[in-house]
Structures are given as C-alpha cells and as structure tokens.
A protein has these predicted regions:
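Active-site rim helix/loop that mediates acceptor-substrate recognition in acyltransferases
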Residues: 17-81, 182-219
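GNAT/GCN5-related N-acetyltransferase fold signature
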Residues: 53, 69, 96, 229-232
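Conserved acetyl-CoA-binding loop-helix of GNAT-fold acetyltransferases
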Residues: 93-98, 102-117, 248-261
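Conserved hydrophobic beta-strand within the GNAT/NAT acetyltransferase core sheet
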Residues: 94-96, 125-131, 270-272
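Active-site/acyl-donor-binding loops of N-acyltransferases
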Residues: 130, 136-160, 230-321
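Amide-forming acyltransferase catalytic core, primarily the GNAT-like/NAT-type
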Residues: 147-242
Length: 321
C-alpha cells in the first residue's frame, strides 16, 4: 500500500463518497460544491493537501482510504522561555468506504502520513486531529488524546452591543487576532486570520445554502479582552473560536454578547471549548454548564522529541478542521 497526493479528479471523486459521512443537511451536489469552495479558500489553497492510500504507487489502483492535512504554525517553549516557531499539521476527513472498513486501512494511512510529516520540514513539531470516533483508532498510530470539555450557554434575548465596547465583523478578524495574547503553555498551535476566516467561510456557505441570515457579528471586544466566533448552522450553535479575557467579568460580558447574537440569529446555544484557564473565567456565569464533549476529541502525535504531554496543550475551537 502506498501514500500519495490526490489529483483534482480524485478529490472530486472522494467528495461524492464522503457526503454520507459529513454532508448532513446538504444534497450530494451541494456538498460537492461546498468542498470545492472550501478548497479554494486562501487558507486551504495555501496549506491543505488531500492524501490517499492506494494499492499501487503514485495514486494508482484502488483507493483504500483518504484524509486531509492543513498546515499550522506552532510554537515550542524553550527552557529559557523563548518560543521556537515550527510547523505542525492538522488532519481531518479520515475516510474509508464502508465496504473496505475493518482491514486497518485508516491506521495504515495514518502511520504512513506521520512518517512523511516527520521529514516534511526541519521545523516539524506535531500532527493534530479532532476525532469523532474515539481515541483507539488513532492511538495505534502514536496519537494521544486530551480531555475534552465544553462550556455551553443558552442563547438569550437582549442587546448584544449593550455590555461590550464593540461588536466585530469579518474585516476585524485579523486585527483582533493580532491583539490576542499567546498561551503560556509549553507548546501550542496558533491559527492564522485566514484559518479563522475559513470558519466564517463555512458559515457563509451554509447560510447561503440554507437560506438563513448570518449572525450579526463574528465577535466582540470588552476593554482589552476579545472573542471571535462562528455559526455552525447544522447544529444551531455559535461556537467561540478564540477567547482572550483577563478577568471573569470580561469573559462574562463577551459570552453574554455571544449568547445574544446567537439568539438573534435563531441559534440555540453558545459553545466554548475548555482550555486550561477557562473554568476560572467562566464559572459563575448564569446559565453556563460544563459538559463532556461527544465529538472532536483533540489528539496529538509528536513529530520530534521534546514535546510536552498532550494534556498541557491548549486547543481552542479556532484550530478545529
């Protein structure tokens, strides 16, 4: 079995097959159009690759499994406290046709891909994925999982602008992200503004296909604190992509604004992925509930020695692919 990059024709063939797994609420044609549009986005056009496991070299023969990789900037803290920049990759859309499952094809694909990524850059740090099928499959390829908790807040009526200094629009994303503090963690991946806009592009696509309005803001600012978020239409959620708050009062103001934006957009709730400092910021916010996440389990495989355990790595929702 061989690892190879997919051609454009092979990508389109996989789109038709993977609709069953990820095309909920869309027709096959709509899903295929969504995939082509997302691949054309500047972030994915620059750093996304589609990989195949095939029976013959150079993509020949039957396709046994497929996945996608997305490039991320990552940072490893040195013993002296400086940040060493590197390259990491997020893996998504791991797929094997039902008729080919149970034969270890996905595990073989992940093992070959990890070996390739180890030599893809002299600055290689890690491969990351967000599993919807538990941890066991990917543990066999050297991945280790982190605990995954969400803070869930119901959408509520009210003026989103009343409790914050500003509501943010798409054009504010890059400036807002640039002003956010980097984590104090020993290792972390950091999204680009283009990656966050990719989340908003998904929002735009579903708003168009479902004929529904987009939320009236994609974030908010309260003093020096800020948050960025995006709609996930098929689950009626507003997901917080990035949150940088210094105090509980700031976090509460930003999340209340998100809940009010969600209500006005016809969404049911706000979801914030827990990071190491999240409980101290969010506890005490009326209506907020901490729940175990049922999908998108963060998992990490080091591509070099010296990385800390996955439990010490923060995973904001903005990194999800």
């Amino acid at each position: 079995m061989y690892l190879s990059l997919a051609t454009e024709a092979q990508k389109q063939q996989r789109d038709l097959l993977t609709h069953a797994a990820w095309g909920q609420t869309l027709s096959v044609a709509e899903f295929a159009a969504r995939e082509q549009r997302l691949r054309a986005h500047p972030w994915t056009a620059a750093g996304m690759r589609t990989w195949l496991l095939t029976r013959e070299p150079q993509g020949g023969g039957e396709v046994l499994a497929s996945c996608e990789t997305f490039h991320n900037d990552s940072f490893l803290r040195t013993p002296g406290g400086a940040l060493e920049a590197g390259d990491s990759w997020s893996i998504a859309s791991v797929y094997t046709e039902e008729r080919l499952r149970g034969r270890g094809h996905a595990a073989r694909l992940m093992a070959l891909l990890a070996s390739h990524l180890e030599g893809a850059s002299p600055r290689a740090h890690a491969a990351v994925l967000f599993s919807d099928v538990g941890a066991a499959l990917y543990q066999r390829s050297g991945y280790r999982e982190a605990q995954a908790w969400d803070w869930v807040l119901p959408a509520v009526a009210g003026s989103a602008a009343a409790g914050v200094d500003a509501l943010l629009q798409d054009a504010d994303v890059a400036r807002t992200l640039a002003g956010m503090r980097r984590p104090e963690a020993p290792f972390f991946l950091w999204p680009s503004a283009a990656q966050l806009d990719w989340h908003l592009e998904r929002e735009r696509i579903y708003a168009e296909l479902h004929g529904r309005p987009r939320p009236g803001a994609c974030g908010a600012r309260a003093g020096e604190a800020s948050a960025l978020w995006a709609m996930v239409a098929k689950t009626r959620q507003l997901v917080v992509l990035m949150l940088d708050a210094r105090t509980p009062a700031q976090a509460h103001a930003l999340l209340r604004a998100a809940a009010q934006v969600a209500h006005r957009a016809g969404l049911s709730r706000v979801v914030l992925w827990e990071e190491p400092g999240t409980p101290a910021l969010v506890q005490g916010l009326a209506g907020a509930e901490r729940v175990a996440r049922e999908d998108a389990l963060p998992m990490l495989r080091p591509l070099r020695p010296g990385l800390p355990p996955v439990e010490q790595v923060p995973f904001p929702r903005g990194l999800w692919v």
